[in-house]
UniProtKB/Swiss-Prot annotation:
UniProt superkingdom: Bacteria
A Pfam family that the UniProt record links to this protein: Aminotran_1_2
Known cofactor(s): pyridoxal 5'-phosphate
E.C. numbers: 2.3.1.47
Gene, per the UniProt record: bioF
Designated name of the protein: Putative 8-amino-7-oxononanoate synthase
Length: 395
C-alpha cells in the first residue's frame, strides 16, 4: 500500500479514537425479533427500526419467496433497461392509493431517494431551506445539487420565514424536512410549513421515513393526520425499511414530478433495480399496514408509556413525542459508557455520536416497537433508571 495514504488513514482513524467517534461492526442475529443476539448475548431489542414488527412476519416472507421463485433473485438491470418488472407498477399504484397522489417512484433506499430528488430538482441558481436536524441524506442531496443551502433552527418557523424573505425573487425555492426526526423523536410542524411554502412560492418535500406505516389514515404518514394537508405537499418521500419491515423507498406526488425524476434522477437511472422478492414483500406490507390499526395503536401506546416513565424519572429526552426516545447525556464517552452498561444487563440500545448528532449532544437512542410487551418495557425502564442514577444523569 502507498505509505502516504497509509499514514493519512491511520492519522484519521486515530483522531476518531481520540474523540470517541470510532465505530465498530457487531455481529447481530435475530434483529427482527423483540429479543436479539448481539455479540453472542441475548438482549431486549430497543435499537431497531422494525417499528411494527413486520420484518419477521410470515406473510411478508411468503410473499418474498413467491416472487423470488417466479422472477428470480435479481432484477438484472436498471428499471430503464429491463429491470422494470410489473411488480414495480403494482407497488407504485398501491402507494398512490395509500397516499392519495397521482404517481409514485420506487427507488433503492431512503438515502438514494433524498440525494436523488433534491439534486435533480435544484441547482446552483436555486435555494434550499432545510431543518438543522434533517437526515444526512437530505444534507448530502443539497450539497450535490450545488444550490444555496439555508439551514433554519430546528422547528423554528420564525427563523425559516426570516430566511425565506432573504431569497431573491429569481431563485427557485425548496423547503425540505423530516416529519419524524430520527435522532430526537419529535415531529415537524407540517401544516405551518405548507402555509409558508404557499406564501413564499416554494415547493415542499417531506421525508416520512420514520412516520410511514405509523401515523395518519391507514398509516400513510404524519402529513395525513390532518384532512387535505397531504395534497398540498409537493413530494412525499418514505421508506419500506422501517415500519414496513422491508427495504427500499418511494417518492410520490404530482405526475409531472415523477416524470421529471424518471429522466433526471441519477440515483434512479444509474443503479440496478430492487430484487423482485423485495417488491413482493413491500406490496404485502403496504396491504397490512393500511388495515392493521391495532399494531399502530399499540406502538403509539408503547412509545408514550416508555417516554413518560423516562421523562418522569428525570432523564433528558428532549421533545420526543413518538416511538423514538433519546436520552441525551452530552459527551461521546458518557454515551458509550451508558450504552455499554445497558448492553451488559441485556438491553440493546446504541450510543449515537457526532456527526450523526450535534457536538455535545451524544445520546443513547431507544426505539420502541409494537411488539414490546409492557413487561418488556417495565424491565428495561427499571434498569435504565438504576444505571442512570449510578451515572448521575438526572437533572
Amino acid at each position: 500500500m502507498n505509505q502516504t495514504w497509509r499514514t493519512h488513514l491511520q492519522s484519521k482513524l486515530q483522531q476518531l479514537h481520540e474523540r470517541g467517534q470510532y465505530r465498530n461492526l457487531h455481529v447481530t442475529e435475530q434483529a427482527e425479533e423483540t429479543w436479539l443476539i448481539r455479540d453472542e448475548k441475548r438482549m431486549l431489542n430497543l435499537a431497531s427500526n422494525n417499528y411494527l414488527g413486520l420484518a419477521g412476519d410470515e406473510r411478508l416472507k411468503e410473499a418474498a419467496i413467491a416472487c423470488t421463485r417466479k422472477y428470480g433473485t435479481g432484477a438484472t438491470a436498471s428499471r430503464l433497461v429491463v429491470g422494470n418488472y410489473s411488480l414495480y407498477e403494482e407497488v407504485e399504484r398501491s402507494i398512490c392509493d395509500w397516499k392519495g397522489t397521482e404517481k409514485a417512484l420506487v427507488v433503492n433506499s431512503g438515502y438514494t431517494a433524498n440525494i436523488g430528488v433534491i439534486s435533480s430538482l435544484v441547482s446552483r441558481h436555486d435555494i434550499v431551506f432545510s431543518d438543522k436536524l434533517n437526515h444526512a441524506s437530505i444534507v448530502d442531496g443539497i450539497i450535490l445539487s450545488g444550490a444555496e443551502h439555508k439551514r433554519y433552527r430546528h422547528n423554528d418557523l420564525d427563523h425559516l420565514e426570516k430566511l425565506l424573505k432573504t431569497a431573491s425573487p429569481e431563485q427557485r425555492k425548496l423547503i425540505v424536512t423530516d416529519t419524524v426526526f430520527s435522532m430526537d423523536g419529535d415531529t415537524a410542524y407540517v401544516r405551518e410549513l405548507v402555509e409558508l411554502k404557499e406564501k413564499y412560492g416554494a415547493i415542499l418535500i417531506v421525508d416520512e421515513a420514520h412516520a410511514s406505516g405509523i401515523y395518519g389514515s391507514g398509516g400513510a404518514g404524519l402529513s395525513h393526520i390532518e384532512e387535505d394537508l397531504a395534497q398540498k405537499i409537493d413530494i412525499h418521500m418514505g421508506t419500506f425499511s422501517k415500519a414496513l419491515g422491508c427495504y427500499g423507498a418511494y417518492l410520490t406526488g404530482d405526475a409531472i414530478y415523477i416524470e421529471y425524476l424518471h429522466n433526471m434522477m441519477r440515483s434512479f437511472i444509474f443503479t440496478t433495480a430492487l430484487p423482485p422478492g423485495t417488491l413482493g414483500a413491500v406490496q404485502k406490507a403496504i396491504e397490512i399496514v393500511k388495515e392493521d390499526n391495532e399494531r399502530r395503536e399499540r406502538l403509539i401506546e408503547n412509545g408514550a408509556y416508555f417516554r413518560n416513565h423516562l421523562r418522569e424519572a428525570g432523564f433528558d429526552i428532549g421533545n420526543s413525542s413518538t416511538h423514538i426516545v433519546p436520552i441525551v447525556v452530552g459527551s461521546n464517552e458518557t454515551a458509550l459508557r451508558f450504552s455499554k452498561r445497558l448492553q451488559q444487563v441485556g438491553i440493546a440500545a446504541i450510543a449515537i455520536r457526532p456527526p450523526t448528532v450535534p457536538v455535545n449532544s451524544s445520546r443513547v437512542r431507544f426505539a420502541v416497537t409494537s411488539q414490546h410487551t409492557i413487561a418488556d418495557l417495565q424491565w428495561a425502564i427499571h434498569h435504565i433508571i438504576r444505571i442512570g442514577k449510578e451515572e448521575g444523569f438526572f437533572v
